Amino acid sequence: MSTAKLVKSAPSALLYTRNDLDDSVKTSTIALLNQLVVDFIDLSLITKQAHWNMRGANFIAVHEMLDGFRTSIIDHQDTIAERVVQIGGVALGTVQIVGKQTSLKSYPTNIHSVQDHLKALAERYAIVANNVRKAIGKTEDEASADILTAASRDLDQFLWFIESNIE
């Protein structure tokens, strides 16, 4: 009979995975990534809000441009959320969570001109693009940093396109 004592470890908030990242790296990375999941969901919805409701000069060009942006944002959002799960987290993307945790201020629903929408979008795209860049510098997980670098490149390009259309 063994005299070894059983040592109970504290329960982990992480889901089991064979991924060997340190638990503290996983935990901090999950928090960073989940905030970005929230921001990307909000940005995708804001983009569609503008897409539906703008009127005026260059409507069709901007309308179609925003559709492409939204598709890419959703693709990045999915990749980021899946990375959360890959490293033992739970991706948080419900409407309730997005409403409580978004970094973006509420999008105005009383604007209609293409220019007003572009200005409102530029402000919000800049916030998300800057938050992604900050997260790249904070994460100690190279795979997550790589995912965020790809998203950062696209967001910077989208912001440039939006700003280039502002008169």
Swiss-Prot record:
Catalysed reactions, semicolon-separated: 2 Fe(2+) + H2O2 + 2 H(+) = 2 Fe(3+) + 2 H2O
Keyword line: Cytoplasm, DNA condensation, DNA-binding, Iron, Iron storage, Metal-binding, Oxidoreductase
A Pfam family annotated for this UniProt entry: Ferritin
Domain of life: Bacteria
Any GO CC annotation of this UniProt entry: cytoplasm
Any one Gene Ontology molecular-function term assigned to this protein's record: DNA binding
Protein location: Cytoplasm
EC number: 1.16.-.-
GO BP of this protein: chromosome condensation; intracellular iron ion homeostasis
UniProt keyword Disulfide bond present: no
Function field: During stationary phase, binds the chromosome non-specifically, forming a highly ordered and stable dps-DNA co-crystal within which chromosomal DNA is condensed and protected from diverse damages. It protects DNA from oxidative damage by sequestering intracellular Fe(2+) ion and storing it in the form of Fe(3+) oxyhydroxide mineral, which can be released after reduction. One hydrogen peroxide oxidizes two Fe(2+) ions, which prevents hydroxyl radical production by the Fenton reaction.
HAMAP family found in the cross-reference section: Dps
NCBIfam families to which the protein is assigned, alphabetical: PRK09448.1
Similarity remark: Belongs to the Dps family.
Protein name (Swiss-Prot/TrEMBL): DNA protection during starvation protein
Lineage: Bacteria, Pseudomonadati, Pseudomonadota, Gammaproteobacteria, Enterobacterales
